[in-house]
């Protein structure tokens, strides 16, 4: 009898421990990263990629990566006024400062930027700088994203973040991939924040969005933020390639 009670107790303790480990692995917090989103409307894809690949193999790009840890990739867009963006991620503001110092001082970078005059519609080029506010799971394991751009009333940012975090904590089983909330620190005239939801395929992403939006938790979230948030647009983002010198 005592042996059975001990077995039940140990089994319950094991379940509790596993639940603790699972909850701990699903932390939703800032990863500390900052990023440049450089938006382009590409008119000559071949010239555009040639310029990017040439710079990628340059000494300037190597120095840029080595001194700042810049993580650079190209993404395609649908549901946007732009066709692509180049994403440059740094671990923190100090690394971005190092990276900007190198990038803006070398001829190879200047030549690449000049080449965009013949491969993109430069009248429609723009950029912003974001800072991660909350993140769950590793976004770099996913290849397709829903990126939701919106504006939050000034002074209500923490209120929105708390509501969004509560929603995502309730939807961990419905979201197979990564997710995050970024604050747009610079270039925020029209957009103050973006939310991303990642997956490994468009069908997986679509199903995740449908599942989340069909819940009472989402209805509660939407109701709680409707007076402090204005939606701008939702973009489908797909991975194209990374630039790591190879």
PLM region descriptions:
Residues 1-9:
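Bacterial N-terminal signal peptides that target proteins for export
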Residues 8-17:
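Bacterial N-terminal signal peptides
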């Amino acid at each position: 009898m005592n042996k059975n009670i001990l077995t039940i107790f140990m089994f319950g303790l094991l379940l509790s421990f596993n639940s603790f480990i699972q909850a701990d692995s699903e932390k939703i917090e800032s990863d500390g990263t900052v990023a440049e989103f450089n938006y382009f409307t590409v008119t000559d894809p071949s010239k555009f990629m040639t310029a990017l690949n040439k710079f990628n193999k340059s000494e300037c790009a190597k120095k840029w990566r080595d001194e700042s840890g810049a993580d650079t990739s190209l993404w395609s867009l649908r549901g946007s006024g732009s066709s692509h963006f180049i994403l440059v991620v740094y671990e923190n503001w100090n690394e971005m400062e190092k990276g900007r110092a190198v990038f803006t001082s070398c001829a190879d970078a200047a030549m690449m930027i000049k080449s965009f005059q013949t491969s993109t519609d430069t009248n429609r080029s723009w950029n912003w700088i974001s800072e991660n506010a909350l993140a769950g799971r590793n976004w770099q394991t996913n290849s397709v994203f829903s990126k939701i751009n919106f504006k939050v009333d000034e002074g209500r940012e923490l209120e929105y973040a708390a509501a969004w975090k509560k929603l995502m904590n309730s939807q961990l089983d419905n979201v197979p991939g990564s997710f995050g909330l970024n604050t747009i620190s610079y270039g925020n005239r029209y957009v103050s924040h973006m939310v991303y939801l990642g997956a490994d395929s468009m069908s997986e992403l679509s199903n995740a969005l449908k599942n989340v939006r069909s819940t009472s938790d989402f209805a509660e979230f939407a109701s709680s933020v409707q007076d402090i948030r204005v939606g701008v647009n939702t973009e489908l983002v797909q991975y194209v390639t990374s630039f790591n010198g190879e």
